[in-house]
Amino acid sequence: MATRNLEKMASIDAQLRQLAPAKVSEDDKLIEYDALLLDRFLDILQDLHGEDLKETVQEVYELSAEYEGKHDPKKLEELGNLITSLDAGDSILVAKSFSHMLNLANLAEEVQISRRRRNKLKKGDFADENNATTESDIEETLKKLVFDLKKSPQEVFDALKNQTVDLVLTAHPTQSIRRSLLQKHGRIRNCLSQLYAKDITPDDKQELDEALQREIQAAFRTDEIRRTPPTPQDEMRAGMSYFHETIWNGVPRFLRRVDTALNNIGIKERVPYNAPLIQFSSWMGGDRDGNPRVTPEVTRDVCLLARMMAANLYYSQIEDLMFELSMWRCNDELRVRAEELHRSSKKDEVAKHYIEFWKKVPPNEPYRVVLGEVRDRLYQTRERSRHLLSNGYSDIPEEATFTNVEEFLESLELCYRSLCACGDRAIADGSLLDFMRQVSTFGLSLVRLDIRQESDRHTDVLDAITKHLEIGSYQEWSEEKRQEWLLSELSGKRPLFGPDLPQTEEIRDVLDTFHVIAELPPDNFGAYIISMATAPSDVLAVELLQRECHIKHPLRVVPLFEKLADLEAAPAALARLFSIDWYRNRINGKQEVMIGYSDSGKDAGRFSAAWQLYKAQEELINVAKKFGVKLTMFHGRGGTVGRGGGPTHLAILSQPPDTIHGSLRVTVQGEVIEQSFGEQHLCFRTLQRFTAATLEHGMHPPISPKPEWRALMDQMAVIATEEYRSIVFKEPRFVEYFRLATPELEYGRMNIGSRPAKRRPSGGIETLRAIPWIFAWTQTRFHLPVWLGFGAAFKKVIEENVKNLNMLQEMYNQWPFFRVTLDLVEMVFAKGDPKIAALNDRLLVSKDLWPFGDQLRNKYEETRKLLLQVAGHKEILEGDPYLKQRLRLRHAPITTLNIVQAYTLKRIRDPNYNVKVRPRISKESAEASKSADELVKLNPTSEYAPGLEDTLILTMKGIAAGMQNTG
């Protein structure tokens, strides 16, 4: 039983209401949504596990809230004593409860953001959103370009219909929530949205409330922990589920909104159905960089699976289209086609495997006759892919299926032209246009799969070939000799190797991947990305291997520059590549380059990485212009600020001028996929943000930095890099401190991804993946990779010359790149709490390292103060009270999980740590007691004391949910 005086203790929702700031507008229901969900959850908790457990959860929450009010470290100790006194089952239940609360808080926030946005659209009021830079919609952007910036409507239309945003979904292991829970969360979100609709009846409200409670209980009763790591095929299926649930219907809905927005600036045309505004690609099953589980067989499987899913989605809609296009009037072109198809079909033909239109369609329904043939081929396309996926072969001939998107679209275009010719354009611009836009966007493969591989793996293959040919060791050759040999082979026609080539397992894997690319239809694939690319030979090597493996339609080859030195050398490498006549002829005036935000940040710290990424883009674009090449930048951004994350619109608008120019590729990783596409409104908003920001950047580029700003940035970057590397790579105590002070070593137990946390099993920070590196610091709310280096750079230049402070403030107020960079770090400080890191040190770190931790926390505080000084703010987030409120609502439950995590890690790492466990407090009924016991038994193979490992994992997941990112 909880020991505090519960009569004096405020309920959780009462405490929530106290957090409501005075300035919140009438349409802001976030506190109300949050309180409703928590009230429902606490009632469920009491029903399932008794009043004592509910009171304990409330007591824990109150202690955390008291700490958040005064930041008294004694409250953390009091909280720790209470938490460590819980038995194994109760400990899991408390951690699970707070993790659940934070997931519910996220859902309340998503519903509120959608509601707030809709209300602002109705009122046309964006005054409190700094011109809505984070929420801008397409109509607002078009009006701004035409009415404020005096662009002609036709100029805007031409730019829009020719631009492309390619969103690349990746399986980066940052989505810590199981798909089973994501689906339940979606239903909770829908219930909450409907509950606050204005036209709801009392009966509707009662039924929705029951449904809400049912889904909250179902989510709480679901095991949050993945008991086995997902396979790449699992990741692919999870990623593809977003297409089925939101993206598939979201794209035509969004394009209709674009049509409406164009009409409102005087353009009476619709966006052409084949305009490439939005494209989708994927790395799921294609990204083999450091992931041995992504094999050639996996790549083949995911391509066939995506092809089957695409055919199935089209097939599920074609009968609706047949019902809609029932008219008999058509043009001669369609009539001739319909009569041919009708004559060639068997008399009295029946198709019992169809639900509708299973008998032969009469010739006086010409649209249905033509669409019926489309349906037949879609059915065969789906079945052939299914056979190939399950059996490896199919008796359905390829000519009975659709093999390219042009032949699929041909019949649809025929119907569209006929309707327009007969005066039925309004009908043509309905479901048929939506369907054609889907076909143009998703093709026959749903997404295009990128292949990613390390450059060293290609070098190993070519080394084996040159040794087999007895012409030397490719690995030992200079760059010049490599290029000379590669170009001579690319210019010739002789095959380089046959079946007698000696192959290690690694070499066979690389070659078999190329063979899979050659075997499958070319529209399955997008780019071939080379990670750790440093020289032109890295690109030419892939070109040669594609030819040797008989790939008829070679993939475009994209070098990925990640580390600071590689980014600095990238422009020169690209210039050398463009100087090669053979290569310039090959690319036909188009090149793509990928830049990595994660590894550059881990290598040099956020400040220097951000500035080098900015400069590299400018220089790469200049090189491309010099050689007459159109360059597309592919941004490898993660969800966290440490890995290049941040609000989409701001991120795009802060890129250097001329670097997007109507063509953008960007990764959508892990938990960001759910945040972007988890629900229809989120999907719609994501498509709007990317399209609007890309258009605005191209037509109204941000300012270029002044020469004196550049000089100051260069100076600060040197200081920031030195500060960052002196601690992370050169400080001999750092690796030991990092592994003791954070849950980095325990990260792999979450089973959130298919790939290992390290590129190589041994080694220090260099071999650690960027995601677990950021994840570990996010969990302790210290965020070291984000801010380390900023403070030292600011301090040095301000001490050198006080005028530099004025210049920094000028840069913040006038230069979007600098402002966005600092604002994102400020947001991270709003989420941070060095006292949590200090508690971790006292519990988990050896005493001789305590002064080192104190030193880092002093740097944290110094950086925070300098950041506020440069931004001209008195306190963190003073310019964004809405975001400040949203973060404050999370602090108490996150703090609870921080404390549970710290003490659980102590018990895991130090078996001699004594705790006095009180009797179980969850309800004493046989059923409830059994429930708590079963929670402990869900992990029977744990090497630790009962309940500890699951409690730890639940805290990791809950903190990730509360911080709204993992790695």
From Swiss-Prot:
Entry keyword set: Allosteric enzyme, Carbon dioxide fixation, Cytoplasm, Lyase, Magnesium, Phosphoprotein, Photosynthesis
Record localization: Cytoplasm
InterPro entries: PEP_COase, PEP_COase_bac/pln-type, PEP_COase_Lys_AS, PEPCASE_His_AS, Pyrv/PenolPyrv_kinase-like_dom
Active site, renumbered: H172, K602
Alphabetized GO MF terms: phosphoenolpyruvate carboxylase activity
EC number: 4.1.1.31
Phosphoserine: residues carrying this PTM: S11
Regulation acting on activity, per entry: By light-reversible phosphorylation.
GO terms, biological process: carbon fixation; leaf development; photosynthesis; tricarboxylic acid cycle
Predominant location category: cytoplasm
Cellular component per GO, a single term: cytosol
Cofactor(s) required for function per UniProt: Mg(2+)
Enzyme class: lyase
Known catalytic reactions: oxaloacetate + phosphate = phosphoenolpyruvate + hydrogencarbonate
Family recorded in the similarity comment: Belongs to the PEPCase type 1 family.
NCBIfam families, per database record: PRK00009.1
Subunit text: Homotetramer.
Function per UniProt: Through the carboxylation of phosphoenolpyruvate (PEP) it forms oxaloacetate, a four-carbon dicarboxylic acid source for the tricarboxylic acid cycle.
Protein name: Phosphoenolpyruvate carboxylase
